[in-house]
Every structure is written in structure tokens, then in C-alpha cells.
Amino acid sequence: MKKTWTIEKARKLYNIEQWGNDYFDINKNGNVIVNIPGEDGKSEMVYDVKEIVDQLIKQEEIHPPMLLRFSHILKHRLAEIHNVFANAIKTYNYTNRYQGVYPIKVNQERHVVDEILEFGKPYQFGLEAGSKPELILTLGAVTDDETPILCTGFKDDEYIETVLFARKMGRKIIPIVEKLSELNLIIKYSKKLKVKPVFGVRVKLASKGAGRWESSAGYKSKFGLTITEVLAVLKILEQENMKECLQLIHYHLG
């Protein structure tokens, strides 16, 4: 009986070109493979997923379902993001630099966070914590005073006090003010701990993006300060002689 199935049909059926982003493909044996690009863009390493699974079953007695992680893809993606911004900065003669941060709510597993920090170190990638547990995790994972830590989410007294303790210890930690009450806490604990804070504000933009999150943008956004509230922040900082402490603007289009 003539075989009608082909590798190209498999690629089309599983739509690999749309989601694989050149990291995934199908080899001549019909198995899914993982391509790890080198610095020249060509495949540096190729892994046959079926061979890996078969080896784990035979040698380690680990059976599906199983989760395979390819750290080299993470490393390549961080480099790719950095290079895209670096090229744009050079093209448009921008006088500053790009510095990304990884929101650990995406994946809080320790080895993932550690790899983000390791692979992102040449680019000074930082972390974003969106809750008290994430803040504690982040402070434990970051072992130097140069990696930026951005703090978002709901902030009570304990959260702000912890942030400013870390600041006093020399950490490069920046809380993002999303409500006026958070600014009052920053002022309160900076005086109590005798530390000069650095913080940002999250702004509600009047403009909207498009797509799934369009309805969450603009002044209807749940989080952030209106322009009127931002002006109030500036007035308070002027009264407290703390204008230089505001060094960051955070916003979402949706």
C-alpha cells in the first residue's frame, strides 16, 4: 500500500510554522525536534524529543506525562530581545539603554528564575514582583545590588517596609505607586528607616490599544493613577522635598 503521509503534511497539520518560531520542527523520522540557534543564527544543537522521552523511560524509568524544559531557548530569547532593542537604539541614536525585567508571576519556579538572572546578567535584566510572596522570593533570588527589582501589585505596610529595608541594605529596588495611599506609606517608612527611596508611578493612559485587553485600558483601567493624581503626587513630593525620588513611569496600553 502506498504511503501518502509526508513530513510536509505533518508540519501543516500541526501548524508548526505558526508557533514553532524555528525552535521546533519535524525531522525525517517524523519526530518533533528542538533546534537551539547559535550566535550565527544556525542550529547549534538539535534534540529529538522522542529520543529524549525514550531515554528517560528506559534509563530513568520516568514515564509520560512529563515536562521538558530547554534552557537554551530561554537564553536565546533573552539575547534576541536585547539585540532587537540594541539595534533600534543604534538606528535612532537613542541616548539611553534598554533594561528588561521578568515578571516572576509568569513562572515562579526557582530554576527558571535563576536561569533568567544568569542568562540576563550581561544585559542587566531584572525581576518584577507583584505580591509579598513574590517579593520575598525575588529578594532571595537576587544576590547582588545591581539587578533591578520592580515592585507592583497590592502594597500594604509590611510590603512597603520590606521594600525600604531592602533599599537600605543597598538593593536596587523600585516600588511602583498604583494608589495615592501607597505614596503615603513610602514616605512614612522612608522617614522611619531613614532611607531615601526611589520609586515610580503607574499611569492610566487616555489612549487605548487594540485587541483582547482594549477594554481594560484608558481611564477605565483598574490600576494606576490618573493625570490629576500624578500631579497630586508631584505636589506631595515637592512638599516633602522628595521630587528626585520619582524616577520611573509605568503604564500599560491594555
Task: Annotate each language-model stretch with its function.
Residues 14-16, 22, 42-43, 213-215, ...:
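Homeobox/homeodomain signature
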Residues 95-254:
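Active-site-proximal beta-alpha core segment in soluble small-molecule metabolic enzymes
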Residues 13-16, 22-25, 55-59, 140-142, ...:
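A general structural signal for short secondary-structure junctions and capping/turn motifs
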Residues 6-9, 15-17, 49-50, 56-57, ...:
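Short secondary-structure boundary micro-motifs
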Residues 27-110:
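Low-complexity, highly charged intrinsically disordered N-terminal segments
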Residues 1-40:
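N-terminal basic/disordered segments at the start of proteins
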